[in-house]
Amino acid sequence: MPATNKGSGVLTLFENWDVTLDNLPAEDLMPACETAIWHDEYGPLVISRIDTSGKGGYRLRMGDDIAVDVHPERRIVARFRPEVSRTTVDHFLADQILPRVLASEGQFILHSGAVRMGDGAILLMGPSGRGKSTLVTSFDRAGLSLMGDDAMTISWSNGQAGAKPVYPSLRLLPDSIEALLPDTVTTTSVAYYTAKRRVTVPVADTNGATPLPIQAIFLIAEPIENGKVGLRSLTIAEACMALVESSFALDPTDVIQARGRLADASELARNVPMFEIRYPRDYAQLPEVRAAILAQVAALETA
């Protein structure tokens, strides 16, 4: 039966949207009215255009198990097979649907983790699998406050770029949990399609809070097998393109919205220092990675 009561949890994040969860038989899960427009190169997510009511809309699905329809009248319908857990559905809504519907409303949402340093934020950006969650956890264990590990809303106030998490979270692979966190930490499953675990750690609930000024952004490059930590400043053009590539979109093919994201990325690239950091994926080297990032931020403050 459909459920629309938001109660508590992930549905409360969809403040002005009507969200329905519909557990349907398999044959009713995928109505044949979709045209695929985008495939995620890092996972099974597919975004399609749909037209079930003559008004258009989008369907985001994860294989044949979950399909979420986003309608233009601020209505979301999530359909899923009976064997799919509510935990998986909630993760898909928070991880993929929420950032994309916010982006469709004109917000600039980055696929990025962040930690708080003093009164500002350091953003750690990169594609899925680059180690954002591992690095923000390492910073958190070293004394900086974790803001979130996946999606950041970027906004402006008096010419200053600020960041706040779309939703507070920390998800890690088992080997990172074992290497970085104490044995007493509590974890729960995230979704059947990922090996990551949700980690119960203190993450400030910043929903509604004032965004923190962004001190710098660090793009995590592909890992190197051996060698020292490398850090280089990105040109404005390089930074702009990296920001565009790391931004969420409900319709990645929408030219008008793409122009808006490009304008947001260009403004951010011109006003916030951005660096590429490259290092071996070795937990023992994370202190050196943190030191390089903090030294660069300190140098910016004294420049």
Kindly give the residue locations of the regions a language model identified:
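A broad, low-specificity signal for short, low-complexity segments enriched in glycine/proline
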Residues: 37-40, 75-78, 83-87, 107-108, ...
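Extreme N-terminal, non-catalytic leader segments
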Residues: 61-67, 71-118
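Post-Walker A alpha-helix
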Residues: 135-136
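Aromatic pocket-lining residues of Rossmann-like dinucleotide-binding sites
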Residues: 139
